[in-house]
From Swiss-Prot:
It catalyses: L-aspartate + H(+) = beta-alanine + CO2. Catalyzes the pyruvoyl-dependent decarboxylation of aspartate to produce beta-alanine. This is Aspartate 1-decarboxylase. The keyword Signal does not apply. Coiled coil: none annotated. GO terms for cellular component: cytosol. The modification Pyruvic acid (Ser) is found at S25. Its main location: cytoplasm. Keywords: Autocatalytic cleavage, Cytoplasm, Decarboxylase, Lyase, Pantothenate biosynthesis, Pyruvate, Schiff base, Zymogen. It comes from Francisella tularensis subsp. novicida (strain U112). Belongs to the PanD family. Heterooctamer of four alpha and four beta subunits.
């Protein structure tokens, strides 16, 4: 049996763009992805702090150091530019494994 645990969390990501007619996904600055240990095409949960919307999608790598956080496709209807997001990924692990440390990136404080 495996359990789902928090793997990575990007806190206070600011939406910088949205493209309703793109096929889907969230575009994230590749440097932020690296800091958070999130890879391209990884499934993530997106939580909008401004309106409470939650959705799941996959990640597209954005330009490094661009600070890009853009929701694409139907997900673009769940946010506005300037909204604050939590972007969360999970891992499936053996429940007997101890000391699982998620990678936390806080864009508000820079940690």
């Amino acid at each position: 049996m495996l359990i789902s645990v928090l793997k990575s969390k990007i806190s206070y990501a600011t939406v910088t763009g949205k493209d309703l007619f793109y096929v889907g996904s969230i575009t994230i600055d590749s440097e932020i992805m690296k800091q958070a240990n999130i890879i391209e095409n990884e499934k993530v949960q997106v939580v909008n702090l401004n309106n409470g919307a939650r959705l799941e999608t996959y990640v597209i790598k954005g330009e490094p150091n661009s600070k890009t956080i853009a929701l694409n496709g139907p997900a673009a209807r769940r946010c506005e530019i300037g909204d604050q997001l939590f972007i969360i990924s999970y891992a499936q692990v053996d429940p007997t494994r101890e000391n699982i440390k998620p990678k936390l990136v806080d864009l508000k404080t820079g940690d």
